[in-house]
Amino acid sequence: MGNILRTPRVVVVGAGIGGLVSALVLAHRGLDVTLVESAHQPGGKIRQVQVNGVGVDSGPTVFTMRWVLDQMLENLGTSLEDILQLEPIGVLARHAWDGGPNTLDLLSDTALTADAIAQFSSPQEARRFLGFCQQTRRLYDTLEKPYIRSERPNLLSMVTDLGPSGMATLTGLGPFATLWHSLGRHFHDPRLQQLFGRYATYCGSSPWSAPATLMLVAQVELVGVWSVKGGMFQVASALANLGEKHGVKARYGVSCAKIHTQQGRVSGVELSSGEHLAAEHVIFNGDVSALGSGLLGSSFSQSFAPVRPFERSLSAFTMSMHAKTSGFPMVRHNVFFNQDYRAEFDDIFHKRRLPEQGTVYVCAQDRNDSGLADPVPERILCLVNAPADGDTRSFNPSEIHACESNSLALMRRCGLEIDVLPQHVVRTLPQDFAHLFPGSGGALYGQATHGWMSAFRRPSSRSKVPGLYTAGGSVHPGPGVPMAAMSGRLAAATLMEDLGLISKSSRVVISGGMSMR
């Protein structure tokens, strides 16, 4: 009888977005929730690096799909506006190409973007862009319910849920085609194919191997991108503070050494200090390969298969700077493309090396659509994609120097000069990410989304081990801040369903939130 009356105890391992959201939702429902995190602050991959006395966002920098958090917070009696200061971005990103003087802005206004493409390329390409937008809209509408909101989608359930009209949409897309091939059907200008092919990297993947369905990422951005005052770290900080107000017991600077089981189900976690936290339920918000490789105990090797190194998603080489810039008129989000795009992904996924000529993403965090008012040092994040082999090798100084020099040279050829002192840049490499996120090998997006079946290979929130649930970017529905938040909602809802606190139909509503329609 005591077990029935006892408030269910939950330990959430990892204070990334998925863990913060699941802890908050469960605490709001009255469960006894303890959150443990090895870092000394919340956020997981949302992290700030201190450079010259200022914090530089050095993880995710784009805030999209705000409806995921909007609906969750509405259920808690608050709103995003109550906990964050958001500003919509008009210029989604500014793009430049090596060897070309022209730039292209993607804008929140689709018609204005079409006008920009007509000037940059041709009126025919502008019309093709508008057709592309219509297809990505239909694709998103088709996949939102049967895939994004589903706790564990599979091919059979998706076919059933899609119905004839949904299947017609997928068939028209060519679901077995790669993203690169499909984009070649939409655009004749290779620069536009390159621009939209970059959306594969949002899932840590190559556009030559990713499925055509990843075109829906374009729709996500076109619906809206926001900047967060104080940086993306404020998202994690606000959710952590709200969780504690609802009763979450957060413990930072504490590592989970092992997840214990008893009689085949979860019984608690052991901390690195040796302390044991008893719990009937554990939500693991980390890279699931840590479970499969035995880093948290041998009990889970049969339930979780670690991602093999060649199946891992992208890692990164990042440079967090406080520096003066000149020349190129940067906005908040900027992309500098190389000439041989395919060679970049061959270097990373096949030759397993830092790209000789990699695309460079630059987040100028003190800028908005109109740029920087005064020529003063600004917070800059430069990111180059890299192979996720951080657990088996470390790049040597000459490799790092070559990649950095090539990246700066590419930006210089596009017109951007960065004047940075050596002590005002912090570099993070795949080996550093492998240390920050155990079991990942430095992969930042879990398993690469390669092949048309890859979307069904991510673990779901409910594991085969009773009482153990998973959340985060390495599980369904995938990487990125909104998807990780969705995974946290799915994990919390699945746990509550197993406790009999909600029905399956209620779980769909709770985890799903509002449509983008």
Segments from the language model and where they lie:
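Structural core of flavin- and non-heme-iron oxidoreductases
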Residues: 1-41, 46, 118, 124, ...
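Extreme N-terminal leader/targeting segments of oxidoreductases
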Residues: 1-10, 28-29, 450-454, 503-517
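N-terminal glycine-rich phosphate/pyrophosphate-binding loop and immediately adjacent elements
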Residues: 4-142, 447
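A conserved FAD-binding loop/helix module that cradles the flavin
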Residues: 60, 473-495
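Active-site/ligand-binding neighborhood in enzyme catalytic cores
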Residues: 137-246, 253, 436, 440-449
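A glycine-rich dinucleotide-binding beta-alpha-beta segment and adjacent secondary-structure elements
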Residues: 189-203, 357-361, 417-477
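Mid-domain catalytic core of redox enzymes
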Residues: 227, 257-374, 511-512
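C-terminal segments that line or cap access tunnels to active or ligand-binding sites in enzymes
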Residues: 324-434
